[in-house]
């Protein structure tokens, strides 16, 4: 049975996982490709390939390079996709490659459908379908737009999760800084101002002499940060202490104090 209902049920089996775990975008693309016999590309707002699936016997080295190797569409092409506000179905191939500067398209009878992915009023990405020799019918478009809606919800959930994680990291750093004494805070400001990037070598005695504090103040400050999971430190004996920042919000919060 290949009715719209049966296809939707197959899709729902994937989507029902979304309550407990993230949806695998590749699974959605694979299913859509199977039931509609087409290429499927799930593209993020900035052109990143979130998922894809090629139909059988599809041969286009240019597209495969963009999707499989680069994992991103060129900016000019993605801008064209983003500017499309409503579903456009059954766009015929005009004989020119969709990527600028490539020239002639060697694949004939290609028909494309572009479905915007929107969530909470924001454009989140694009669902791009390509078929050869057969137009997409109404059932195909219903399934594609349903999938785009679900993907939009998942992208919104992922975005919210990122926002919550950012807030958590920031709160952890603020709490860690709040446990420092004035002299310890002064010490960490000097320590991390001398780091090149997210990690580096610290010689506590040199910083202690430079700032005019005891070495124990530096050691205590680092222990507090390490206990909070903000940094990781490893003694290298006479060479000093190797420090690695684990929470990227640390430097931003220290800059606010200055």
Curated annotation (Swiss-Prot):
Keyword set, alphabetical order: Cytoplasm, DNA-binding, Repressor, Transcription, Transcription regulation
Q: Does the keyword Transcription regulation apply?
A: yes
Q: Which family does it belong to?
A: Belongs to the CodY family.
Tell me the GO BP annotations in alphabetical order. negative regulation of DNA-templated transcription; positive regulation of asexual sporulation resulting in formation of a cellular spore
Query: What does the entry list under GO cellular component?
Result: cytoplasm
Tell me, in one coarse class, where this protein mainly resides. Answer: cytoplasm
Localized where?
Answer: Cytoplasm
Quote one Gene Ontology molecular function term. Answer: DNA-binding transcription factor activity
Q: Coiled-coil ranges per the record?
A: none
Protein known as: Global transcriptional regulator CodY
Q: From which organism does this entry originate? A: Clostridium perfringens (strain SM101 / Type A)
């Amino acid at each position: 049975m290949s009715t719209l209902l049966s296809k939707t049920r197959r899709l729902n089996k994937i989507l029902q996982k979304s309550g407990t775990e993230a949806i695998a975008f590749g699974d959605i693309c694979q299913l859509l490709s199977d039931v509609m016999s087409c290429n499927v590309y799930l593209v993020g707002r900035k052109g990143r390939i979130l998922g894809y699936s090629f139909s059988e016997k599809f041969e286009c080295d240019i597209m495969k390079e963009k999707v499989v190797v680069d994992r991103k569409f060129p900016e000019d092409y993605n801008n064209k996709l983003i500017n499309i506000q409503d579903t456009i179905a059954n766009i015929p191939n005009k004989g020119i490659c969709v990527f600028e500067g490539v020239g002639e398209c060697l694949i004939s009878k290609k028909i494309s459908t572009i479905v915007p992915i929107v969530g909470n009023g924001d454009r989140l990405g694009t669902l791009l379908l390509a078929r050869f020799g057969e137009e997409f019918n109404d059932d195909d478009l219903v399934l594609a737009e349903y999938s785009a809606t679900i993907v939009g919800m998942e992208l919104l959930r992922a975005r919210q999760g990122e926002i919550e994680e950012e807030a958590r990291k920031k709160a952890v750093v603020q709490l860690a800084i709040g446990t420092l004494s004035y002299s310890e805070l002064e010490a960490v400001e000097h320590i991390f101002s001398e780091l090149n990037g997210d990690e580096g070598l610290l010689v506590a005695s040199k910083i202690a002499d430079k700032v005019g504090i005891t070495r124990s103040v530096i050691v205590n400050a680092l222990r507090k940060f390490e206990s909070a999971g903000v940094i990781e430190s490893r003694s290298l004996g006479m060479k000093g202490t190797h420090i690695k920042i684990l929470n990227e919000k640390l430097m931003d919060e220290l800059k606010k104090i200055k």
